[in-house]
């Protein structure tokens, strides 16, 4: 299912919410009616939480079906909550807190910012149980903001080159394409939320943008 709505009253749904094929993690202050929309669209249960006491969950964590890597400032009660959900939890070493902004991952691979240390890369590799590749994309290090990826496909910044798209295909093991959401927004990772069952994009997204999202994320294969 593909929905066009501003869940958090602005286009940046990927900054506030985290989703995998198993669950969605949403801020405590998100209205129950919005939580229900997420659950219906992504076909998962949603849990209300925070990271480091903050509602920017999508920016401060990255997850797949195998685990979750979070900001080093995560609170003990938050770690306990994730562990009780059956998640393998690890904090990223170093000074970088916005893990979700600098890592894009599915169950096959992850692309991370090149400034992450070897230690941080190893934590991501072990926790998410994936192969990790470090690189910049479209001249930027905010990989997680540039890419929305699931186990069925990926959508990345419209300025990505063919070589970069091919690189992402190799790492993630799925097909994908470039595009925008929200009437021209290139930071598709920040302004969309997706798993293998569905996606939510900014309310302002146009028909052609929706069609590209549907194709890039592999939903046409379900028709």
Swiss-Prot record:
SUPFAM superfamilies: Pentein. GO terms for biological process: cytosolic ribosome assembly. Transmembrane segments: none annotated. It holds the Pfam family eIF-6. Keywords: Initiation factor, Protein biosynthesis. One of its GO terms (molecular function) is ribosome binding. InterPro entries: eIF6. Belongs to the eIF-6 family. Binds to the 50S ribosomal subunit and prevents its association with the 30S ribosomal subunit to form the 70S initiation complex. NCBIfam families: eIF-6, PRK04046.2-5. This is Translation initiation factor 6. It comes from Methanobrevibacter smithii (strain ATCC 35061 / DSM 861 / OCM 144 / PS). The gene is eif6.
């Amino acid at each position: 299912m593909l929905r066009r709505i501003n869940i958090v009253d602005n286009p940046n749904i990927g900054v506030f919410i985290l989703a995998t094929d198993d669950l969605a993690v949403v801020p405590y202050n998100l209205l129950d009616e919005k939580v229900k929309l997420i659950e219906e669209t992504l076909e998962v249960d949603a849990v209300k939480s925070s990271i480091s006491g903050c509602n920017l969950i999508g920016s401060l964590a990255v997850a797949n079906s195998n685990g979750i890597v979070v900001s080093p400032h995560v609170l003990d009660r938050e770690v306990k909550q994730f562990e009780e959900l059956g998640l393998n939890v690890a904090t990223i070493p170093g000074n970088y807190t916005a893990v979700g902004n600098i890592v894009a991952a599915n169950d096959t691979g992850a692309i991370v910012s090149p400034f992450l240390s070897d230690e941080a890369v190893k934590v991501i590799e072990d926790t998410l149980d994936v192969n990790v590749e470090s690189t910049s994309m479209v001249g930027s290090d905010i990989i997680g903001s540039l890419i929305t990826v699931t186990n069925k496909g990926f959508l990345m910044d419209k300025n990505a080159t063919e070589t970069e798209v091919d690189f992402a295909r190799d790492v993630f093991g799925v097909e994908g394409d470039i595009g925008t959401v929200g009437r021209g927004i290139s930071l598709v990772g920040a302004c969309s939320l997706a798993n293998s069952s569905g996606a939510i994009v900014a309310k302002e997204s146009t028909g052609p943008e929706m069609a590209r999202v549907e194709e890039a994320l592999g939903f046409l294969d379900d028709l």
